[in-house]
Amino acid sequence: RHPDRNFSKNFDDVVPSAAISYGLSEMSNIRVGYNMRLNRPGIWFLNPFRISATPNDVSYGNPDLSTEKSHSISLSYNIFTSKVNLNADARYSFVNNGVTGYSFVDEDGVRNSTYGNYVRTQRTSLSVWMSWNITDKTSFMLSASGSYVDLRSKELGSSNSGFGGNLYAQLQQRLPWKLDFTAYGGYGAPYISLQGRSGSYNFYGLSLNRSFLKEDRMEVSLFASDFFSAWKKYSSTTVTDTYRQTSHYKDYACRFGVSLSWRLGSMNVNVKRTER
């Protein structure tokens, strides 16, 4: 009845990986590894049915898409102590058949949006994760990453490159009267795509928690987030040979609230020890 909705697709892939780890001490090690990751397109990427949002705008999937294969080579360092846990990872990855969404204007002036295995991507990145017990009552956590990405497509005649990354930090403090205070914040750099980029973003928040009743079964939390700038503004830009599109939108991000959680039941764990 609707032949343009009928399609089938099978994927068969081999996924190799290898790693070598060397202990520098009882609490630290380095690791070199290679792995391949798969990104199989979902049904919305494959479905060829044409959806017309407006007379001049149509979108559809591509049933000929193949599995996107990402190859990655990494070098990581780990150290674990009573005060600090640290992981640092340097990585180079590449994709030769990346799935991308792209748009073009046809002879009738209609903008077509679909997908193809048209992108070659190279990415170099460095990431760090750290957990630091500053005192018995104070802890700090940091997660940060930075990368440079280069995207190219001969089929579409497009290329783009740039720096990206994100940052998240969290401070926890144990206060008198069984109160736990948490402050957190984060930042995300613009996301780079083949035909454009999105804007950056940031967020932050505070929370105050306290447990009640026997075995701390009930927890009450007061929280607030993004209270200095209630409205967050975002933007994204798409550039092709035939048109340029810039979108602006905003979201009400400010939040204040109270939450209550109650733990039911109990779990007792007995660990059997073996004496040598």
Q: What are the functions of these language-model segments?
A:
Residues 2-7, 57-63, 110-117, 152-157, ...:
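Extracellular loop and loop/strand-boundary signature of outer-membrane beta-barrel proteins
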